[in-house]
UniProtKB/Swiss-Prot annotation:
Topology of this chain in the membrane: Multi-pass membrane protein
Function: Carrier protein involved in proton-driven auxin influx. Mediates the formation of auxin gradient from developing leaves (site of auxin biosynthesis) to tips by contributing to the loading of auxin in vascular tissues and facilitating acropetal (base to tip) auxin transport within inner tissues of the root apex, and basipetal (tip to base) auxin transport within outer tissues of the root apex. May be involved in lateral roots and nodules formation.
Disulfide pairings: none
Cytoplasmic membrane side: 1-59, 101-135, 194-196, 254-266, 336-356, 400-422
Cell compartments where the protein resides: Cell membrane
Provenance organism: Medicago truncatula
A cellular-component GO term for this protein: plasma membrane
Gene from which the chain derives: LAX4
Name of the protein: Auxin transporter-like protein 4
Length: 482
């Protein structure tokens, strides 16, 4: 077996390799040192902290605005319990993905496979460990989930900006932000999201605490009612939105690949989740306390919070963060497309950006067809997130280490808090059964029922989903007619 140090070796990204290839004189190096250090500080991130910021920033984006809506469907107690429950099992399956990545990496390096100019992805890990059928399964679910994850960010951009400027309808804003988000084609990999991840987490932190404080200061609305849960359809729809919230680890492999020492990732997602709890729980609790059942008809919390400079700042910061999260969701799709057309090892940023553009077009189109901010989260959570980041990783881990020899030679042994392979298998089996029955089964039924109801109510290509009807022009007074 390879040593741990060998398993931890990082793959240098295309940008680093391009910069370091070729000879330079000592004088030239000295001249460029300060500029290089500044550029590296902003552009090249492969540390544990970079991974933590990426995980935390990516995990909580526009869902922050829909969690109060989920609380109105679930009720206060169930909302809090489901957040903690899905946060913990999401952290566990992210840990499983990291273990399988390290196992795959170690086996391939033992075979002297060179990953220069190649970003390892989840479907390749499944292919190397379990074969081509698992590769196809992973590729189908991962790409479809990330596609709709990008769609959701685009819908959220249009939904949010409307609360600052309602002179344009949400569909027009979707056109505009689709063009803006397309600029993410210029970001080569997760290695280059250092400054964006840091800023993104700061933006969501501000927004979460603004929501909590604004709701408390505003107080409860008159005759507020907290009747949830009232219907099974709403209950499981809300639960599935929370499952979606803590299912942001579909990009775990790409984040690990950007690290200098990927094996240190093991508990990063869990630590990121703990921080995310400090944002999602207080904000959702406070907004639901203030507005109660009114949230059932307002999936975006911004629509109920008082309009002022603080809210406008939160909207703008969330817009920027959704641009970042769009890049997080879309970058793995860019990699897949590059590999399909044979351009993945291209070093030119401009050429790579050009060949990536076709990926954005279907995302743009789908965001215009299904502009249902809120309900679409639950539908994606039930049908895609359940398999992509919960069921498939748990099953893959069980099958990879099903033999005694595989367990004996495993690069990563069971964690100290769960030292028995039997306990690991029991936990994995529980996750598979729970998510399959509750998440995919009940959640799928509830989410699709709610989603179809939105289509029946608003129609496909809805011009302005959940917008207030325009105020009819006032008739002129009798005196004005003379």
């Amino acid at each position: 077996m390879l040593s741990q140090n060998q398993a931890e070796e990082a793959i240098v990204t295309n940008m680093n390799e391009t910069e370091q290839e070729g000879g330079s004189s000592l004088e030239e190096i000295a001249e460029d040192q300060s500029m290089f250090n500044f550029k590296s500080f902003l552009w090249h991130g492969g540390s544990v902290w970079d991974a933590w910021f990426s995980c935390a920033s990516n995990q909580v984006a526009q869902v922050l605005l829909t969690l109060p809506y989920s609380f109105s469907q679930l009720g206060m107690v169930s909302g809090i319990v489901f957040q903690i429950f899905y946060g913990l099992i999401g952290s566990w399956t992210a840990y499983l993905i990291s273990v399988l990545y390290v196992e795959y990496r170690a086996r391939k390096e033992k075979e002297n496979v060179n990953f220069k100019n190649h970003v390892i992805q989840w479907f390749e890990v499944l292919d190397g460990l379990l074969g081509r059928y698992w590769k196809a399964l992973g590729l189908a679910f991962n790409c479809t989930f990330l596609l709709f994850g990008s769609v959701i960010q685009l819908i959220a951009c249009a939904s949010n900006i409307y609360y600052i400027n309602d002179k344009l309808d949400k569909r027009t804003w979707t056109y505009i932000f689709g063009a803006c988000c397309a600029t993410t084609v210029f970001i080569p990999s997760f290695h280059n999201y250092r400054i964006w991840s840091f800023l993104g987490l700061g933006m969501t932190t501000y927004t979460a605490w603004y929501m909590a404080i604004a709701a408390i200061v505003n107080g409860q609305i008159e005759n507020v009612v907290h009747s949830g849960p009232t219907k099974l359809v709403l209950y499981f729809t809300g639960a599935t939105n929370i499952l979606y919230t803590f299912g942001g680890h579909a990009v775990t492999v790409e984040i690990m690949h950007a690290m200098w020492k990927p094996q240190k990732f093991k508990y990063i997602y869990f630590l990121a989740t703990l921080y995310v709890f400090t944002l999602t729980i207080p904000s959702a609790v406070a907004v639901y306390w203030a507005f109660g059942d009114e949230l059932l008809n307002h999936s975006n919390a911004f629509s109920l919070l008082p309009k002022n400079g603080f809210r406008d700042a939160a909207v703008i910061l969330m817009l920027i963060h959704q641009f970042i999260t769009f890049g997080f969701a879309c970058t793995p799709l860019y990699f897949v497309w590059e590999k399909v057309i044979g351009m993945h090892d291209t070093k030119s940023i401009c050429l790579r950006a050009l060949v990536r553009l076709p990926v954005v077009i279907p995302i743009w189109f789908l965001a215009i067809i299904f502009p249902f901010f809120g309900p679409i989260n639950s539908a994606v959570g039930a049908l895609l997130v359940t398999f992509t980041v919960y069921i498939i990783p748990a099953l893959a881990h069980m099958l990879t280490y099903r033999t005694a020899s595989a367990r004996k030679n495993a690069v990563e042994k069971p964690p100290s808090f769960l030292p028995s392979w039997t306990a690991v298998y029991v936990l994995n089996a529980f996750i598979v059964v729970w998510v399959l029955v509750v998440g995919f089964g009940f959640g799928g039924w509830a989410s699709m029922t709610n989603f179809i109801r939105q289509i029946d109510t608003f129609g496909l290509f809805a011009k302005c989903y959940q917008c207030k009807p325009p105020t009819p022009p006032q008739a002129p007074s009798p005196h004005a007619r003379h």
